[in-house]
Amino acid sequence: AQSFLRL
């Protein structure tokens, strides 16, 4: 998973 998905 990309870090931008970790909101």
From Swiss-Prot:
The modification Leucine amide is found at residue 7. The keyword Secreted applies. One of its GO terms (biological process) is neuropeptide signaling pathway. GO terms for cellular component: extracellular region. It comes from the Eukaryota. Keywords: Amidation, Neuropeptide, Secreted. Belongs to the FARP (FMRF amide related peptide) family. FMRFamides and FMRFamide-like peptides are neuropeptides. This is Extended FMRFamide-1. It comes from Striatophasma naukluftense.
